Amino acid sequence: MSRRRHSYENDGGQPHKRRKTSDANETEDHLESLICKVGEKSACSLESNLEGLAGVLEADLPNYKSKILRLLCTVARLLPEKLTIYTTLVGLLNARNYNFGGEFVEAMIRQLKESLKANNYNEAVYLVRFLSDLVNCHVIAAPSMVAMFENFVSVTQEEDVPQVRRDWYVYAFLSSLPWVGKELYEKKDAEMDRIFSTTESYLKRRQKTHVPMLQVWTADKPHPQEEYLDCLWAQIQKLKKDRWQERHILRPYLAFDSILCEALQHNLPPFTPPPHTEDSVYPMPRVIFRMFDYTDDPEGPVMPGSHSVERFVIEENLHCIIKSYWKERKTCAAQLVSYPGKNKIPLNYHIVEVIFAELFQLPAPPHIDVMYTTLLIELCKLQPGSLPQVLAQATEMLYMRLDTMSTTCVDRFINWFSHHLSNFQFRWSWEDWSDCLTQDLESPKPKFVREVLEKCMRLSYHQHILDIVPPTFSALCPANPTCIYKYGDESSNSLPGHSVALCLSVAFKSKATNDEIFSILKDVPNPNQVDDDDEGFRFNPLKIEVFVQTLLHLAAKSFSHSFSALAKFHEVFKTLAESDKGKLHVLRVMFEVWRNHPQMIAVLVDKMIRTQIVDCAAVANWIFSSELSRDFTRLFVWEILHSTIRKMNKHVLKIQKELEEAKEKLARQHKRRSDDDDRSSDRKDGALEEQIERLQEKVEAAQSEQKNLFLVIFQRFIMILTEHLVRCETDGTSILTPWYKNCIERLQQIFLQHHQTIQQYMVTLENLLFTAELDPHILAVFQQFCALQA
């Protein structure tokens, strides 16, 4: 830090001032680098580095105290995997400068309050954990920490608040105990027993209706799928029974015990959990993912049991590493494989399990799906001799458990596995999965293999996929993705509209205009009625069929050719698809043409929605139509539906944002007018108020359309599921068919993937669709969803 003390020779005042500013910035950057990098690989020991850094920071406190405070609060929040390193550093600084220690504690409490107010509950957990570990470093007095935890657990006694609020405060308390439980029990055992008793009482009366919706597997063998608070409570109970002996947390402060025990401690200021408000959004509950146990790696170090607190600590630290470095896959992979204490645990098994736990987390993974694919690829490159084998073992386990796996997680498994294979020349021992060849094609295993090969084809080409799998798998291979043109062979001569199709083909090739196409279509007879209207464009399925079939056939060369065709003849599409029936029929014909090319179907539907040829409700009705019944359980169908819902949601959000911006602009103009007597602003206000009124109408119309879309989707789900249940009851057969599992879990998927939007329409859904008279099997899904934020 000697840069600050350099003397500068200069003749003028201004250059000297500029150099001082530059020098201060350099020093601040250097401090940031030192603080962020402490604990990384170094020639010196961690203890030596911490002692040296504490000395540097102490020397810089007079000039850079606020910067140092801010940096330490930030790393406490953003680098939780290095928690004990930073608590030790704060402990050393507190021992040297008591006032700084007090200011740091106050700053942390302020930051905790801000995080809770801003609904940053994940960061708030790390701040609470950091504060609790400061007890071990003799910065915070144990009784005041116990008092804070008493206030946390008192939230369980609150009335008329969501369960997820109570859950968070209990979790914040329990998840800190692996670090500080021993110290708190030694100092305040009676108070801690009282807190434990309150916690246990709460956990026993908690509702767990939400659990089935969040489980990766419906079966508890070989590993139970436990609710996260139940699992953590069992781990803490075992830790308490073992006299708080924990062997995995890095505790560098133990090396400085003689220094830290002499330091004066601070009492936490009284902390009252902020009250629940309408704007409070708490973390959703989770189910703990388990894939491995000690039997899966008999030769290596023993994997801690599921109720061992070491399992919690290891998983928590690995999750924290991913959270800190997920945007840099190479750095993230390097940090994971260099995890401290890696020789004491089967690290590769833990890493793979944690990554799949995040990928399969419901309702959504913490990060985008493709990040996990790229991270696993990097890990395979870093550990080529060991990690690919563990990953292959995990893949085999997932395949074996497909029968009870959530459909949403199966989708993610398909997407991950196909993408992963594409990076390794699609090599896989397919013969090991030949058991799927003897099963019904709708069963989970053959269905999974079929969908994987379909996705692989998107990342390669059809013939290559045929070449990489054994001939015995041919029934599961995707069809050749070619266009099916019904007017293309001699046998089609007798088909209605054949002659018009020939005329259209010539016209398209001759670069005909929209008007010329209208002229050709004008005389196409309408099979639905004797007399057409004057314009000749009332819903006419034959017109749509001839036009769409011929145009898509001629534009079949590529995606861009098809897009150009839609754009050029947009006016014809809009006219033919003017009615709801017309929109539905356009989708049906497009599907007939591209039945063997799911990717083309998906991109064409996407384009038709964007260009307003069809609307979102038409797509939903088409997906539930009889024409798609054979493909109803195919993955591409549900990708289209979710994409459609997302488009609708984005459309509503876009208009809402425009409305908010207009209102803010008007408020600014009002403020300016009150500050400055400007009469011309009256005219501006009038124009803006008109714009706000128009936007308000657009928002209401868009929300009505959005609500209608969800009503259509849920109504169709209820209809087809009810038909299935009634049919099974009439026939005396089991309802638990592969189709039923897929369908009921697709219903769950809609709720989960769009939960934030659907929450707005809960009352409408409950009053109109999910009523008490509904079959309990279907109603249970709605009740599980309601329980997620209850």
From Swiss-Prot:
Compartment list: Nucleus; Cytoplasm
Record gene name: Ncbp1
Species the sequence originates in: Mus musculus
Residues bearing the modification N6-acetyllysine: 204, 698
GO biological process terms, semicolon-separated: 7-methylguanosine mRNA capping; alternative mRNA splicing, via spliceosome; cap-dependent translational initiation; defense response to virus; histone mRNA metabolic process; miRNA-mediated post-transcriptional gene silencing; mRNA 3'-end processing; mRNA export from nucleus
Chain location of the short sequence motif Nuclear localization signal per the record: 3-20
Protein name in UniProt: Nuclear cap-binding protein subunit 1
Region Disordered, annotated ranges: 1-26, 666-685
Cross-link (Glycyl lysine isopeptide (Lys-Gly) (interchain with G-Cter in SUMO2)): 684
UniProt key word Transferase: no
Positions bearing Phosphoserine: 7, 22, 201
GO terms assigned for molecular function: RNA 7-methylguanosine cap binding
Main location per the UniProt record: nucleus
Family: Belongs to the NCBP1 family.
Domain MIF4G: 28-240
Keyword presence, Phosphoprotein: yes
Record function comment: Component of the cap-binding complex (CBC), which binds cotranscriptionally to the 5'-cap of pre-mRNAs and is involved in various processes such as pre-mRNA splicing, translation regulation, nonsense-mediated mRNA decay, RNA-mediated gene silencing (RNAi) by microRNAs (miRNAs) and mRNA export. The CBC complex is involved in mRNA export from the nucleus via its interaction with ALYREF/THOC4/ALY, leading to the recruitment of the mRNA export machinery to the 5'-end of mRNA and to mRNA export in a 5' to 3' direction through the nuclear pore.
